[in-house]
Every structure is written in C-alpha cells, then in structure tokens.
C-alpha cells in the first residue's frame, strides 16, 4: 500500500515564506511547515491535559489517549467527543461513563505538555508505571514481516515527506502490511491516534504489531501493551525502563529496525526467521 500521492490533510501543514541558503547563495522560497497547536482534553467538563499536537484525527487521539492512559477500559465507556475550536487552540470534550470518570479522579493528573509529553504533571511516581495484564501469546511473526511493516510505514508518511517534522505509528498485519497509519508532531500523540483508530476499527489488535518512527521509550511500550498488541518495532533504540516493562508484560520489543536489521530486546521467541547463533 502506498499513499505517497495522497494530498496533504487540511489543517496538517502551512505553506510559509522562508529564506534558504544553498551553495552559499541566499534565496527566498516557500516551504511546508507542520501545524502544531495546543489540544486540551476535558472529561465530563473537567480539564485534564493539554498536549501540543497536529490537529488531525482528533477523535482517534481523544479515544486513544483515554484508553492508553487507563481512563477508559473500552470504547463503550466513551459516549461522545466534541471538538471546540478557539484562537488559542482546540478543546476535545469527552463524555465518558461514570466509572471512567471515577478512575480519572482517583489518579488525578493535570498535564501541560511539551510536544507529546507523556509525564508532565504526574502527581505520583505510582502513576508513571501502572500495572497492566500480561499480553497473550499472539500470532507467530517474522523478522521479514517487521521489516516490511517499517518500509510500508515510511512510504505512507505523507506529512513527514512534505514537512520533515512529524512522527508516525502504524498497525501492521502479521504479514507486515501497514493497515492503519497515523502521523503527529509528537510520537506519543501519533501512537495515541493509532490506538484510537484501532479501537474504532474491526481489526483484532493482538493479531499484528505496531511500528513507530521514534525510539521505544517506556510510554510507547506502555501504550502498546495497553492496546494489547504483542510486538512493538521502533526505528530507534529502547531505554532501560521500556525494556523492563516490555519484559514484564510479555511484549516483544525490537529497535533499530532498518532494512533487514533489527535489535530484539525482549521475548525473541515470538519472532520466526531468526538465524542461528554463529
């Protein structure tokens, strides 16, 4: 699947005047710049978080954020999302079930984040790494499928190709076909959008894997586990905390996925096609 010929989404980029220099010669030009705006999330009228995000796929973002943060236990706990636009930014007003609102109040957070900040304003260390049930075994996957998924993700990054400023996350089938892709200036936001899109779709999340264009930080691992996806493939490295969480949760974590090369940090048994040790 290749979406490189798809035009830019409305509101995702702006064409701005720039001053360029090439071979020591200055020139005037116009260039596409990714849009970044404050996006506030309200739950039943109570302000909860402000993220800096690309203003596309906002319904997916709202649902995915609430699911990956453990505020919602399922899509059925979200009754609706209203998008309110103002000069200073966008407010996503989520109407959630009373049980979900009670969970939110029990682990009160008030975040004002940098781009995609996943921890800003966390009031307790206990809220940083929350316990999640171990992942199911899931399907047998192959290193070839992981490599294919990362290639397809790269080919489908429409906004990144034009602006060079955004991350992307994709859900890929067991064969490596990238079936859902979301982009955002923040890596956490891109993954939240993907989690929301997965929840809205009929795709069984545990039958494939997630590929991301960033490092595998612990938040990315935690969000993948919360989405019940058994493998996370990242183009860059993992961290010590991300690796520990992946190990405990039964997540296969792969980093430095570039071409046919990759590094497997945890649970390599889930991947077929690994060469024998020399």
UniProtKB/Swiss-Prot annotation:
Active site: 117 (cysteine persulfide intermediate)
Pfam family of the protein (one): FdhD-NarQ
GTP-binding in keyword set: no
Any GO molecular function: sulfurtransferase activity
SUPFAM superfamilies assigned to the protein according to its UniProt record, in alphabetical order: Cytidine deaminase-like (SSF53927)
Subcellular compartments: Cytoplasm
Highest taxon of the lineage: Bacteria
InterPro entries cross-referenced by the UniProt entry: Cytidine_deaminase-like, FdhD
GO biological process, one term: Mo-molybdopterin cofactor biosynthetic process
GO cellular component terms attached to this protein's record: cytoplasm
Keyword Cytoplasm: yes
Keyword list, A-Z: Cytoplasm, Molybdenum cofactor biosynthesis
Homology family: Belongs to the FdhD family.
Functional description taken from the UniProt entry: Required for formate dehydrogenase (FDH) activity. Acts as a sulfur carrier protein that transfers sulfur from IscS to the molybdenum cofactor prior to its insertion into FDH.
Protein name: Sulfur carrier protein FdhD
Taxonomic source organism: Variovorax paradoxus (strain S110)
Taxonomic lineage: Bacteria, Pseudomonadati, Pseudomonadota, Betaproteobacteria, Burkholderiales
């Amino acid at each position: 699947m290749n979406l490189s010929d798809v035009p830019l989404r409305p509101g995702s980029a702006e064409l701005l005047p720039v001053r360029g220099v090439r071979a020591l010669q200055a020139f005037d030009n116009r260039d596409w710049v990714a849009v970044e705006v404050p996006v506030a999330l309200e739950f039943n009228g109570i302000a909860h978080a402000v993220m800096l995000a690309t203003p596309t796929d906002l319904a997916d973002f709202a649902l995915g954020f609430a699911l990956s943060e453990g505020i919602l236990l399922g899509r059925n706990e979200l009754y609706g999302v209203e998008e309110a636009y103002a000069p200073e930014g966008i407010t996503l007003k989520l109407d959630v079930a009373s049980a979900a609102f009670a969970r939110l109040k029990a682990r009160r957070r008030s975040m004002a984040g940098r781009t995609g900040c996943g921890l800003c304003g966390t009031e307790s260390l206990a809220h940083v790494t929350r316990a999640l049930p171990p992942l199911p075994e899931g399907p047998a996957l192959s290193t070839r499928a992981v490599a294919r998924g990362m290639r397809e993700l790269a080919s489908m990054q429409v906004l990144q190709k034009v602006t060079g400023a955004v991350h992307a996350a994709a859900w890929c089938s067991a064969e490596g076909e990238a079936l859902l892709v979301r982009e955002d200036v923040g890596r956490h936001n891109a993954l939240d959008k993907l989690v929301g899109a997965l929840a809205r779709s009929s795709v069984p999340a545990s039958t494939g894997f997630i590929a991301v264009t960033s490092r595998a930080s612990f938040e990315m691992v935690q969000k993948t586990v919360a989405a019940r996806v058994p493998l996370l493939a990242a183009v860059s490295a993992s961290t010590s905390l991300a690796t520990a969480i992946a190990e405990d949760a039964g997540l296969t974590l792969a980093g430095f996925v570039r071409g046919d090369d990759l590094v497997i940090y945890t649970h390599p048994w889930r991947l077929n096609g690994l060469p024998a040790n020399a």
